[in-house]
Amino acid sequence: MNSTLQNQTKTNLEKVGTDPLDTFPRRHIGPNLQQTAEMLKELGLSSVEELIDKAVPVGIRLKKSLDLPKASTEHKILQNLKGIASQNQVFRSYIGAGYHSCIIPGVIQRNILENPGWYTAYTPYQAEISQGRLEALLNFQTMIIDLTGLEISNASLLDEGTAAAEAMFLAYSVRKNETAKKFFVSELCHPQTIDVVVTRANPLGIEVQIGNHESIELNEDFFGVLLQYPATDGKVIDYTSFIQRSHNVGAISTVAADLLALTLLKSPGEMGADIAVGSSQRFGLPLGFGGPHAGYFATKDEFKRSMPGRLIGVSKDSQGNSGLRLSLQTREQHIRRDKATSNICTAQVLLAVISSMYAIYHGPEGLKNIATRIYKFTSIFANVLKNAGFSITNEFFFDTITIQAGAKVQEILNRAYSKKINFREYKDGKIGITLDETVNLEDLKDLLEIFEIKNTDIEKLFVDVSNVPDSFKRKTSYLTHPVFQSHHTETKMLRYIRKLESRDLSLTTSMIPLGSCTMKLNATTEMYPVTWPEFGAIHPFAPADQTKGYKIIFEQLEKWLCEITGFAGVSLQPNAGSQGEYAGLLAIRRYHESRNESYRNVCLIPISAHGTNPASAAMAGFQVVVVSCDPNGNVDLEDLKAKAEEHKKDLAALMITYPSTHGVFEESVKEICQIVHSCGGQVYMDGANMNAQVGLTSPGEIGADVCHLNLHKTFCIPHGGGGPGVGPIGVAKHLVPFLPGHVLVNNATGNEHGAVSAAPWGSASIVLISWVYIALMGSEGLTNATRNSILNANYIAKRLEKVYPVLYKGKNGFVAHECILDLRPFKKSAGIEVEDVAKRLIDYGFHAPTMSFPVPGTLMIEPTESESLEELDRFCEAMLLIYQEILDVQNGTLDKTDNPLKNSPHTAAMVTSDRWDHLYPRERAAYPASWLKDHKFWPYVGRVDNVYGDRNLVCSCLPIESYQ
């Protein structure tokens, strides 16, 4: 061994002590100490703390460190979590009520649910680098259209309850009789669905009438009806005549339908329904103690422009080939704001993809066989119980029977408990039992033994089971497109999944510098527990003694989030940031009502706010009043004072984002809060930019009363290509009593206040990700993450500001965790639009930053703390090379219309075509930077034509000829 190596080895040995080596913050935060020093030098600063002192106003800084547990190591945290998981008891749950155990095909679990190539992508705003996901979502829409028998479907909603509430709002929006204010809900709907619908109705002044669909006297005061199919107690009812009755009085009919049942039973469309809603959970998604699961929403073509949620449509690209895209975006909150069809942005893309793949893997025959097997097991069970003297209350059923157990009910439940089986318990002594895909002969024998029935020849009975009665039987075909006929072996399925994955750019490819989106690392260790059965196989309505592990996670996470936000209480129920906004505003509304100030209905919102803000305010029943911004991007204090004073008697709230959507820490934020409070209002803080606050300041310190957090931004839940998300809210002490409750579960605030999500704790299984993240980082790690997010953003701003002016800075010349680059001058000087730069970045291997928000013609960049200096430099180099291309257009070196920017992105097919008629070389199109020779991401399509797609709307799979 030479002396140099000996000295190096000795030095390394001296450094290694007893401390654990698998610490996490150094894995999560991109820049190392040397890189940090280089970045600070570029900024002319001597330390990160000096940067923070200049960027973050001293008046809002926390006086002490966060009181959180010491950071754990990756190995240790998984050991600890296994111990917590063991406190959950995994019973066989036959509770039903819209939630079912299912078998998740391994090829789908491993290659989608557990694959960062799928779960780290962003919402497919940039269509050219999202074609894989878009195709999977188009498959989902086609699946929903076929099974429901309706004409158009969106690409998922948050859950069944939310979808039903959205259906009510659509019916209300399109009603022809402006005086109609009543909405009928069948008492046979799932209780949690009714709960969410009633919550949504109250602020809008809608009167929900719950009752028997057979006896209700509909009249022109009703604008809509909601039915459950099959009913929550298992009854299968043909609603055709009732739907006709509703149409006779001008009411829109919605059917909440079980997708698997629709493979055997008459579809909602066949019954004349206008809307079908539901959940795709039993198509390959774990129970997860309530979520996440993909809700669905299908309707008639005439209502397409009033639909909520994302809609995938077929268009064409620059080469005339088919290209998929988000369609009819003018319906959505980021454009229509308080006039939007819904406040929902992030939905459940990853879960919708999984459900569509489940349908593809099994195909129509496979799904029908699964449904038939469940129906046969249920029929045998019902027949044997009847023969034993038990009364079954529903004559026709699919998978659920309700049993009148009488005096034996407690004995039966005790025997079920001894076999680790859950049933649904009704208050009137009935028992509900719902069978599912996982049930086998041994399970059925156990069920019969619970009812003291033994020695039954089940296999013989299986042969003799009658089919679904003709009057209920489905007569129409479904899933006829070749995609549902072609991938039934694991090899073919694996290759199809991989093919689609290769068409999408995710964090496995490069940084995704989307402003206000916080596309940070979603670490593998954080993701591990999501698919553990101790968490994944728990029914949301399982008894509390079976969910002690979840209780520990919820209590600890709520405590940690209270510490981070400076608030007194947290609700984890909202299953998206949009729902967090809605829940927070409802808490404010209820607070004012409790003080006999229900007349407070004005919500002040800065003009720069996220589009969800005004959309959520409208949902919560508030009147939106817009507040101006000054030339520096801050809230205009004089305008705020004037409008707060003008509405002093009816001011309910101000919604504000901090740091602002302009990427700066406003110096006057505490004064802003004081102005609103002095006029009787509450301050709602949008937590979209919380990644710049953690450990440095907090909503509570600033003076806010409520704030939603995006766990899928700040706290590492992956975006999933457009969901799932989690949007918990933190509130000050006086608002704690007004947090959302749930009709089926008593939580910390009771259940007097209605639910905003179908499940009591929303998307419970993925809050584990945020729990692990906080436990791994600890107080110091979280604060350093915040510091580095601010450092990275300022480094990019500094490197690019000479050629791309940074539109807004704080008073000391620094930005927060994101910056806005002004590209507007290039439109005049070179005819180059911001979209041209965004699409050209694809050729360099990058997802574009946020385009034209909050200022048209700009790019908003948020690099997050997870990106290394090498990646930041690569992005900056791409932007600088693009600037040179713009100069080449300006000085005539490149043509004004035929140039790499206008023709971007360039596909492999384009640059290898026999014909190349462009005025620049192929190599400049394909390899504009040296690093691309080492690794190149190729877009699958050229630039997609948005206008063509909306004018020629197609939202289901194209015929097979289009693929030839």
From Swiss-Prot:
Pfam families, from UniProt?
GcvP2_C, GDC-P
Q: Please tell me one Gene Ontology term that the record gives under cellular component.
A: cytosol
- Sorted alphabetically, which SUPFAM superfamilies does this protein's record hold? PLP-dependent transferases (SSF53383)
Q: Which reaction does it catalyse?
A: N(6)-[(R)-lipoyl]-L-lysyl-[glycine-cleavage complex H protein] + glycine + H(+) = N(6)-[(R)-S(8)-aminomethyldihydrolipoyl]-L-lysyl-[glycine-cleavage complex H protein] + CO2
| Keywords, sorted A to Z | Oxidoreductase, Pyridoxal phosphate
Q: Which residues carry this modification: N6-(pyridoxal phosphate)lysine?
A: K713
Q: Which domain of life is it from?
A: Bacteria
One GO MF term on file is:
glycine binding
Query: Which cofactors does this gene product need?
Result: pyridoxal 5'-phosphate
Question: Segment Disordered: which positions?
Answer: 1-21
What does the UniProt function comment say about this protein? The glycine cleavage system catalyzes the degradation of glycine. The P protein binds the alpha-amino group of glycine through its pyridoxal phosphate cofactor; CO(2) is released and the remaining methylamine moiety is then transferred to the lipoamide cofactor of the H protein.
Family label: Belongs to the GcvP family.
Describe, as the record does, how this protein assembles with itself and its partners: The glycine cleavage system is composed of four proteins: P, T, L and H.
- According to UniProt, the name of this protein is Glycine dehydrogenase (decarboxylating)
Q: Can you name the source organism?
A: Leptospira interrogans serogroup Icterohaemorrhagiae serovar Lai (strain 56601)
